[in-house]
Amino acid sequence: MQDLLNQILDEVRPLIGQGQVANYIPALADVPANQLGIAVYGNDGQVFSAGDADTPFSVQSISKVFSLVQAIGHSGEAIWERLGHEPSGQPFNSLVQLEFERGRPRNPFINAGALVICDINQSRFAAPALSMRDFVRRLSGNLQVMVDGRVAESEYQHRARNAAMAYLMQSFGNFHNDVEAVLRSYFSHCALRMSCVDLARAFCFLANDGFCKHSGEQILTRRQTQQVNSIMATSGLYDEAGNFAYRVGLPGKSGVGGGIVAVVPGQFTVCVWSPELNSAGNSLVGMAALELLSQRIGWSVF
């Protein structure tokens, strides 16, 4: 495995320069584009990594999985009364579909759906941002995981479209807490800084029927784990989920910080990071690396 990871990074590194770092979030635009890391975490606890796998980066939308898992943990099936689990086929920050469907988001991984999940968690936790940080620390086994305050503030200052979604949902009765407070929590989640190794460890319960071996916790039931993985497979990579299924064939979740996490049910979790994005907002080099890894080991679930 170690030799394979090294080989794959060597093969995809020439692709650096063909994408573009996220520039609509000023604090992310400064990230050096030539960084590249990958980590694989096995259900037996073995970790393999290569490149910049220990370098923390902004997880961005990858955090939506953690928020969803929190909400399922305390509210179960009730959360689906407020949002769906269908692919959207629209950009992740679209207002058009949200208006047409009367404020009920298609799934928890588009921005509107993630905001509803944060609203649900806001009603449950006295300090949602701290609760999320501590939850992710337990899952990753890294007590040094922190929120990048500069990134969170940068995103809050550019919150107009997310605020519009929240207020639109509020007008349909599908948003219950103070919009600005929920936005603060949401951006705090997105601004978590984690490495490839951190994220591969943190997602390991999704490859192990909901059980996190290193923390000894049953995070989700087996059925809930299957449900989360299925939504990742259909909606985890914005409007490029079909292409990811075709090329990689695994449940996955990406973020505009350049990270992609993928789950090999029953076996492994993988995280790859390269800051340059393709036109769909997913890591260009990361997609290529995961495609090679999945093909060469035969990991596709299809």
Swiss-Prot record:
Disulfide bonds: none annotated. It comes from the Bacteria. GO terms for biological process: glutamate biosynthetic process; glutamine catabolic process. Signal peptide: none annotated. Substrate binds at residues 61, 111, 155, 162, 186, 238, 256. Pfam families: Glutaminase. It catalyses: L-glutamine + H2O = L-glutamate + NH4(+). Keywords: Hydrolase. SUPFAM superfamilies: beta-lactamase/transpeptidase-like. Its EC number is 3.5.1.2. GO terms for molecular function: glutaminase activity. Homotetramer. Belongs to the glutaminase family. NCBIfam families: Gln_ase, PRK00971.1-1, PRK00971.1-2. HAMAP family: Glutaminase. This is Glutaminase. It comes from Pseudomonas fluorescens (strain ATCC BAA-477 / NRRL B-23932 / Pf-5). The lineage of its organism: Bacteria, Pseudomonadati, Pseudomonadota, Gammaproteobacteria, Pseudomonadales. The gene is glsA.
